[in-house]
Amino acid sequence: MISKVMRTLCTIGVVILTLTACGGPASAPEEQLRAWVAAGAEAAKDKNRRELVSMISESYADARGNERSDIDNLLRVYFLRQQKIALLTSIEDITIYDDTAAKIEMTVGMAGMNDSVLGLSADAYRFELELERDADEWQLISARWGELGEEMR
């Protein structure tokens, strides 16, 4: 039963990612940023922490006081607790500043199979990601997030 739910969530996620990419003609930086989000979602689904952390700038800092190493540790704990992960991403807005910086506003539904009583956990969060272009790569320099309906910080 749970496997069926996970397959359904993954299918919905692929559809949403595909539809997100079909928002009309996008600029080259916008296409790169959408690809960056898709790559991050795929790395999370595969529990590839190394790939995710490589997408974060060495100088990352956020309002919660986290640095890159703190985000790495958050990912480590989440990936250890979840046997399987499914993400549903919806990009609401991408703002690009001089092709060298960007802000992405998005909602992410997260589901994971784990050893809890129900065997499944699910949450939905809003994210504001700030990115900077370093050479040809986009790097996350800061982020704010919060559960849907709650204040982001």
Question: Where do the language-model regions lie?
Answer:
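Hydrophobic alpha-helical core bundles mediating ligand binding, dimerization, or RNAP-core interactions
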Residues: 37, 56, 75, 108, ...
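Short, low-complexity N-terminal intrinsically disordered segments enriched in polar/charged residues
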Residues: 20-49, 54-55, 72
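Surface-exposed, charged secondary-structure patches
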Residues: 77-119
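A short gly/proline-enriched turn/hairpin at secondary-structure junctions
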Residues: 55-68
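Bacterial N-terminal signal peptides that target proteins for export
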Residues: 1-12
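Short beta-strand edge/turn micro-motifs at domain boundaries
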Residues: 101-103, 121-153
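Hydrophobic core
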Residues: 13-21
